[in-house]
Amino acid sequence: MGETLGDSPVDPEHGAFADALPMSTSQEITMVDTEMPFWPTNFGISSVDLSVMEDHSHSFDIKPFTTVDFSSISAPHYEDIPFTRADPMVADYKYDLKLQEYQSAIKVEPASPPYYSEKTQLYNRPHEEPSNSLMAIECRVCGDKASGFHYGVHACEGCKGFFRRTIRLKLIYDRCDLNCRIHKKSRNKCQYCRFQKCLAVGMSHNAIRFGRMPQAEKEKLLAEISSDIDQLNPESADLRALAKHLYDSYIKSFPLTKAKARAILTGKTTDKSPFVIYDMNSLMMGEDKIKFKHITPLQEQSKEVAIRIFQGCQFRSVEAVQEITEYAKNIPGFINLDLNDQVTLLKYGVHEIIYTMLASLMNKDGVLISEGQGFMTREFLKNLRKPFGDFMEPKFEFAVKFNALELDDSDLAIFIAVIILSGDRPGLLNVKPIEDIQDNLLQALELQLKLNHPESSQLFAKVLQKMTDLRQIVTEHVQLLHVIKKTETDMSLHPLLQEIYKDLY
């Protein structure tokens, strides 16, 4: 007979996985025995484009697991945000020359351009988007749409060229004392006042800057835009409050942020560099040098390396499921959904989120392990015997493309919430409230990306496309697990993962 939470019947088929979800404090939580031999090097959860460091993710590391104990869910201290439709907005021990080669690989190189097909774009919403005009950065001189950061300010092509010609040719204009108003249509009428306006807003030949906009300038600009948006569209303030709440919850739920992982991978940290594992010898050295949270039992040292690594990944995945579940509780409206639907949403969403966040720990050459203490090379993982050598390659391919989008933790916090609240998961009982929550999250994500990446007009569509890619990766992962189940008869999956994978794709 199924357990109940209030009036919500709990499908007994969900078993232990349902124990990760809301239950009254008086109810006992079923404990899942996770006692299983494993090797303590695990993979984590995140995403990496290491040339530009941003915010949040996981690491592959093993903690002692005897039980999976999910605490009861209580309503988060959060002021409800209405779900009505709003108008948008990765050593020091040098074994040989080959190690030095891999050490240099830790620095992330520019990722290849992301694949995107407009034909597969998700969530095309037929509502008006006045946000486009609100987000257009205006020329500080005439108010036309700015083409970039020119001579120290944001300016359009016309005013940039006008200022350049004036300075280069040392032009002197007839004085005008009328203080003419300079705007898009009148900017060519009074050259004197136009040049004075250029100087007044801060244009200077000495202010030419190359490369990306300085962070301080970017923050100032975003603050100005945000203020204007909130005044013109008060509902956007609710979306930004939602984004901040999700970011705060994300930071509390996940131990290794994308920003920290990128700092490790790019060497921009005061901590020592991660220990590089690229072959069997370095693997054995790593087991001595890296401070794993769980000591591998001596009797397990004889197990084949591929199996030990695979089992280690399993236990990290279990830990990740717990972290994701805690995060999901803090998504406004999630704990009010039917309990069976909460289980279903997590069952289908956790691995998509794991691979999203795993990307933060990756570059094209390898992945951070054990909370950034180690770096296991892509080639080493790829050369493990089949089918184990096939598991990580699709994740690396996805990470390279996903990292090219340069999302930071504040972006990822909303993106993974959108993944969780997917109303098209099989077996959902009440789709409407799920879609309502996701629709609000999508609007918050769109606004967040426009504010945080004003130069990337198509980023929202590209990010949503990655949701389709993630589903394909999970499908392929499950298919490989079926192969292992048939070929590795002496090895079993973790009970919680068995439950998640059951009937999954």
Swiss-Prot record:
Effect after changing S112A: Increases basal and ligand-induced adipogenic activity. Abolishes repression by PER2 on transactivation activity. No loss of ubiquitination by FBXO9
Protein name: Peroxisome proliferator-activated receptor gamma
Start-end of NR C4-type zinc fingers: 139-159, 176-198
Organism: Mus musculus (Mouse)
Tissue: Highest expression in white and brown adipose tissue. Also found in liver, skeletal muscle, heart, adrenal gland, spleen, kidney and intestine. Isoform 2 is more abundant than isoform 1 in adipose tissue.
Record's subcellular location: Nucleus; Cytoplasm
UniProt GO molecular function: arachidonate binding; chromatin binding; DNA binding; DNA-binding transcription activator activity, RNA polymerase II-specific; DNA-binding transcription factor activity; E-box binding; nuclear receptor activity; promoter-specific chromatin binding
Function: Nuclear receptor that binds peroxisome proliferators such as hypolipidemic drugs and fatty acids. Once activated by a ligand, the nuclear receptor binds to DNA specific PPAR response elements (PPRE) and modulates the transcription of its target genes, such as acyl-CoA oxidase. It therefore controls the peroxisomal beta-oxidation pathway of fatty acids. Key regulator of adipocyte differentiation and glucose homeostasis. ARF6 acts as a key regulator of the tissue-specific adipocyte P2 (aP2) enhancer.
Highest taxon, organism lineage: Eukaryota
InterPro entries the record matches: 1Cnucl_rcpt, NHR-like_dom_sf, Nucl_hrmn_rcpt_lig-bd, Nuclear_hormone_rcpt_NR1, Nuclear_hrmn_rcpt, PPAR-gamma, PPARgamma_N, Znf_hrmn_rcpt
SMART domains in the record: HOLI (SM00430), ZnF_C4 (SM00399)
Gene assigned in the entry: Pparg
The keyword Transferase belongs to this UniProt entry's keyword annotation: no
Portion annotated as DNA-binding: 136-210
Ways its activity is controlled: PDPK1 activates its transcriptional activity independently of its kinase activity.
